[in-house]
Amino acid sequence: VYADREAFESTYVPLAPEKIVIQNASIYDGDGGEFFETDVLVEDGKIIAIGKDLPFSNEFKVIDATGKWVTPGIIDIHSHMGVYPAPGVRTSSDGNEATSPVTADVWAEHSIWVQDPQYALALTGGVTAFHILPGSANLIGGRGVTVKNLQRVTINSMKFPDAPHSLKMACGENPKRVYGNRGQAPSTRMGNAAGYRKSWIQAEGYLRRLNEYEEKSDEAKELEYAPTRDLEMETLAGVL
């Protein structure tokens, strides 16, 4: 009830697999191995063989990788792709909900512009997935999302199926600068810590009330309302 992955569910559909042979590549295997002038056979979306002069049928699509590198897909674990798209203009710069130091109720995926041209640029550099987060203006900036680097019309069709939510928190200069400059808390690191403590204490209380209600009998539940839904507390209770 407090961190529902089914909300805004992924509609990702894998690309149709091809039979591919990549020839004469320089390869980093991601485990310390390096291979040169080497072939890679891919079938049903999986690497089935690596070696020199591999035999293959004429069903395979041939990619000449002479002078090029083949590596595992790079996963960008801290990205603002799509929430700060290019070109960087105010109308689409939606990575920080800098209206309160704690905005745990917002989700980065609701700001992502899927037409950000940086996706294609990143793909040319081998980046195949992103963990996209809100910015660091706030103590608690909201939920992050994991997406595949695909050309799609909606963010739901890019979302990595069953990937857990994450939570962006910023502990240093940015929150105290953003809010201190406005004459608000936090303006110091001790203000940062106090803001965190207050939020997590509130979340503990919210979670306790939820659990107490769920433990009641069906008869008792008919006599009282469930705790009032709070989107901010839902996220924090989900972390707890």
Residue ranges and their predicted role:
Residues A16, F36, S57, N96-S100, ...:
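Soluble non-cytosolic domains of exported or imported proteins
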Residues Q118, L123-L240:
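Polyanionic/metal-chelating signatures
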Residues V21, L41, D76, H131, ...:
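Structured core elements
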Residues V13, E18, I27, D31-T71, ...:
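Histidine-rich, glycine-flanked metal-binding segment
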Residues V1-P17:
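N-terminal pre-domain segments of enzymes
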Residues I27, I48, W69-V70, S79-G82, ...:
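Solvent-exposed loop/turn segments at secondary-structure junctions
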